Amino acid sequence: MNLIYGAIFRRFFALAIFIFCYFPIFCFSKKNELKSKLITISVNGLLISSLISFFSLMYVHIVSDFSVLNVFQNSHTTKPLLYKISGVWGNHEGSMLLWILVLTIFNYFIFKLYNKKNSTFISKTLETQAFITTGFILFTILTSN
């Protein structure tokens, strides 16, 4: 059963990179109605996939699922619960995933709280944010286990 959560973590992380790679393409769309729908789907999908990724990693740390290499290297069965939770971002992979989660939450709030008068500015801001987050996700995938 616990192997499923490690797979969920990896699948949603891959989904996040897929969405981030296509997000800038959505921003270049000429039709405003299509553009706003695609950006809405992208921003929500990114937030959900990042949240699921981070919390599934947190779950496998809490239940001490040692089939996940990150848990095997950075956890112990006798650790108190608080240390297991804080141990999620106490290593390279977890801290990078937390940073990606913070970036996607920031991206979501930019999208939700923007002023309609500056939609071009917000679109460019979201596009730039997507490029930055894509870089972090690629770095995490390529340098982490």
Where are these regions (language model features)?
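Polytopic transmembrane helical bundles with strong interfacial aromatic enrichment
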Residues: 1-145
